[in-house]
Amino acid sequence: MSFDIAKYPTLALVDSTQELRLLPKESLPKLCDELRRYLLDSVSRSSGHFASGLGTVELTVALHYVYNTPFDQLIWDVGHQAYPHKILTGRRDKIGTIRQKGGLHPFPWRGESEYDVLSVGHSSTSISAGIGIAVAAEKEGKDRRTVCVIGDGAITAGMAFEAMNHAGDIRPDMLVILNDNEMSISENVGALNNHLAQLLSGKLYSSLREGGKKVFSGVPPIKELLKRTEEHIKGMVVPGTLFEELGFNYIGPVDGHDVMGLISTLKNMRDLKGPQFLHIMTKKGRGYEPAEKDPITFHAVPKFDPSSGCLPKSSGGLPGYSKIFGDWLCETAAKDSKLMAITPAMREGSGMVEFSRKFPDRYFDVAIAEQHAVTFAAGLAIGGYKPVVAIYSTFLQRAYDQVIHDVAIQKLPVMFAIDRAGIVGADGQTHQGAFDLSYLRCIPDMVIMTPSDENECRQMLFTGYHYNDGPTAVRYPRGNAQGVALTPLEKLPIGKGLVKRHGEKLAILNFGTLMPEAAKVAEALNATLVDMRFVKPLDDTLILEMAAQHDALVTLEENAIMGGAGSGVNEVLMAHRKPVPVLNIGLPDFFIPQGTQEEARAELGLDAAGIEAKIKAWLA
C-alpha cells in the first residue's frame, strides 16, 4: 500500500531516527498515535505479528529519540515487538511486505538494516549479545551505548539469567529494558513509580549513591547499614530485588505508554555506569481493543478487517497436524493416567489447548525453557511416567545436549512430538525446521519416524508412546493434513517401510509428508514408490532390495540433505558395497528465506514439477 501523508502527517516527517530527533518533544504523543494507527492499517492488510508491536510504540519512539541510533546499539529480543522500530528506521513504506517473499524480514535482521544490530527470531539472546557488544564498545572507546529490550516471557529463559549473572560480574555499561506486558498498571502505583524512577535514575541520587559507597566503603558496619537502608527504601515500592542481587541497578516499574516519562527516565539512565535495568509496564495490543482483550489470538494475524475487530475464521477444511497431535494426546490421556505432556510456552501452536483444559494436572508449560523441558521429561520417565514433549523442530535445537545426555544415554522412554518440521514459511531462516533429522539421526538408540499423512502420524505417535527401550521422535509439518481416513490405532513394526507403488528402473524412497508429490512423480515416471516411515532404524533390507531391483534410487525428504535421511540410505548402500546411483533430494545447504510454504517448495524444486525435473536432469 502507498503511504498516506494526509492520514499520518507527523509520521510522514520521520523516515529515519535523525528526522525523529528533530521533532519537538511535544509532538511525540501525536507521533505515537499515528504510528500505532499505521501499524494497525499495515498489518491488517498484509498479516504479521501484531499485538506485541502495538505495546511497544512509546518505548520505540523514546529509545530512538534519546539514543543516537544506529551509532548507539539497540537490540531487540525475539523481534515480534520490533515492527514500530522498522517503521521508524527507513522501512516505513515497505512494512506492508513484511513476512512475504522478497519483503521485509519478520524479525530484526542484520542484512536488512544497520539499525538491526542482532538478527533474532528465537528468544532470550539479547542480553548475552548485548554484553559482548557493550564490551566491544568499551574497548572501542567511542562512547557508544548498548540497550537490550527483552519481554517478560523471554526473560524467563535460563540463557537470559546466565547473561545477567555474567553482566553483574564484569559490569559492562549497558541498559536492559524489561518490557512487562503481563501486569496492569493501576494509576496510583504507576504514578508513584514513574516519579520514583525519575528520582532514582537522576544524577543527584546516582552521585549520592556512588559517593556514599566510596566514602564509607572502608567502614563495614556503615556500608552494610547504607545497603540495607537503600534496599529498604527501594524495596517498599520496587520489585527489583532479584535484578539488584544479579548486580544491576534496578529502576521501575514505570508506565511504558508514557512517552514523555520514558524519555525523561532514559535520558537520566543514559550516562549511568555499569549494568542498568529498567522495568516498564505495557499492555499488549495497546490502542486496539480487540487485541487488548485477546492478545494471544492477536499475537500474529492474517489479513483482517480492523473495523470488525474479528479475525477471519478458518474455512473449516482439513485439520492441521497440530490438531491431529492434540486429538491423539487427549485420546491417549483418557486411557492412560501415566501420560504427561510438556511444552516450552507453545500451548496454542502445538495443539495442546484442549489437553491443558481436560488434564490440567498432567499438563506442564515450562515457559521458554527448552533445556529444562527435556530434562524435566527425563525425570518424569525415571519416575515411571510417560512424558510427551511437544516442541517445534527449530526450538528442539536449543536442547540438543539434554536429548543426548539426559534422555538417550539413559535410554529413557521420552517421546518428542516435533511440530513445524521442514519448511515453515513466513517466519524465515530462524524458524525453518530443516535440521532435526540430521541432528537426531546420529544419536544412538533413537527411533525417528516420518509420517506421510495424518493417519500414519497418529499410528506413529501411538507406536512411539508405547516404545519403552529409549527415546522416540515423530516429526510432522506445519499446515493442514491430507484428508485420509483415520484407522484404529495400532503399533507399527519398528524400522519397517512400505512399498506403495511398483514401477520399473527407478525407485523413490520417500520420508515424510512430501508423499503426495512423490506419488505424482512416481506415476509420471513409472517409478516404484516407497514410504520409508522410519529414518532410524532404517529398513536396510528394503533399501537393499530396492537397490537390487532398480537401476537408480531417489531419496526425498523435507530436511537438510546433509546428514539427513538420504545420507542414511547412502551409508547403508556403501556399507553393503552396493554402488547403485542415488539422487538425494531435500533442503539445500543454505538458510531458507521467508515466503509461503508453497513458494519455498516451488523455488527449491520440492513440488511435483520440481522433483520430476530434478530426476530427469539427473538421469539425462
Curated annotation (Swiss-Prot):
Reaction catalysed by this enzyme? D-glyceraldehyde 3-phosphate + pyruvate + H(+) = 1-deoxy-D-xylulose 5-phosphate + CO2
User: tRNA processing: is it a keyword of this entry?
Assistant: no
Any GO molecular function? thiamine pyrophosphate binding
**Record text on cofactor binding:** Binds 1 Mg(2+) ion per subunit. Binds 1 thiamine pyrophosphate per subunit.
InterPro entries with a match to the protein in the record: Dxylulose-5-P_synthase, THDP-binding, Transketo_C/PFOR_II, Transketolase-like_Pyr-bd, Transketolase_BS, Transketolase_C, Transketolase_CS
Query: Quick one: which residues bind thiamine diphosphate?
Result: 80, 121-123, 153-154, 181, 288, 370
Leader sequence range is none
Q: Assembly and partners?
A: Homodimer.
Specify the protein name.
1-deoxy-D-xylulose-5-phosphate synthase
Lineage here is:
Bacteria, Pseudomonadati, Pseudomonadota, Gammaproteobacteria, Enterobacterales
